[in-house]
Structure formats: C-alpha cells, structure tokens
Amino acid sequence: DYDNGYSLYIGIPFCPSTCAYCSFTSYPLGVWKNRVDDYLDALEKEIDYTAQKFYHKKLNSIYIGGGTPTTLSPAQLDRLIRKIKCSFDLKDCLEFTVEAGRPDSITREKLLALKKNGISRISVNPQTMKQQTLDIIGRHHTVDDTIQSFKLARELSFDNINMDLIMGLPEETLDDVRHTMELVKELAPDNVTIHSLAVKRAARLTIFKDRYSDMQMVNTQEHMD
C-alpha cells in the first residue's frame, strides 16, 4: 500500500564475530552479551514510539535484521517478537522476516521460537560455500554448518527461506562461485539474494588493508552471470 502503508525495519547490532567486509553497526556478542537486555529495553521504547506515530497507517512488512538477530537467545527473540505483535496491528502485514543470518548463531530452540511466533520468512546466509573464504573473512562456521542449519529450518517447516551470497570475496575464483551456486541449488532455497562486494571505509578489509593486500578480489559480469 504505497499511499497508506509502511514497512518496519528493526536492527539487532550484535554478531558472533565481525566479518571482514562488513561496515554495518555491529558489536561482538562475547563482549556485549550482558548489555543485550538493556538494548532490548531501549528498543521497546522505540517500538512504542513508532507504533504511536504510525497508528493510522497499515503495516505491510516487518524485517528484523542486523547484525545477527539470532545472537539473541530464544527467550529474547520471543520477548522482541511478542512486543512487536502487541504494539502493532499486523492484519495487513504480508511478510514478517527474521534474518537468522549466520549459521553459527542458529539453533533448534531459536528457530522454534520464531516458528511459534508466526515468522513467515527467514534468511540463512552463508555468503559463500568455500571454507577457505569463510576463514579469511572471519566467519566462524563451516560450510556444513550452513547446510545443517538450512535442513533444520526445513525440518521445522519453514517454507520461505532466503540465502544471501556475496560475489567478489577475497580469493574467490569463477569456479568457486560455480561450486557455491551448485551447493545452494541442491538446498533449493525459496529465493537467493546476490550482493556484489563493496568495500566500505569502516570494513576490516579497508582498516587492515595491508593484511589483505595480496589477496585477489575480483567481481566481473561473468561471476554475476
């Protein structure tokens, strides 16, 4: 509804670790774990304010991103989603997405908390299916973690799963991209989002550029095709 509708984005600024390409506001959970509930306290106040300001409009979609929303515990996820459901009228909401994101943050208990609260879409984001690249960019999970997290979500009856991939990551060749796409195709996600690597000034790839200076980062039309 372009005239009377709006979409709601809620950011959870915590991650298991900081990816080398990331320039978003994100804090390592290991350091900030004891402040997550404080963040949710503040977030609930913003939710109340937003609900009051937009009460006369139709809420069409909700996206909980980050960061990594599934760094929250099952109880914290339940708290946040219940707050959203209590504060907003969701009768016109067509899609409610939670970016499960990093496979190393996904558990059965967290997925069950999402399922119980009626989340209609999740995202399981490997970025690549090449283990060497995952290690280089600081993602502390394996390719198999991605596969098992995806299969777990399917087992729990999630029928709208997105997967994010990034083209142009360090040391990735065209054959690596083909390999990633073959593995993703086997999983058969409901949609795939392809990002082209853009190195921003706040990313570790820029801040510690000497560490990555000898690494190839190539993204061509052939890769995208």
Regions found by a protein language model. Give the residues of each.
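Canonical Radical SAM [4Fe-4S] cluster-binding loop centered on the CxxxCxxC motif
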Residues: 5-38
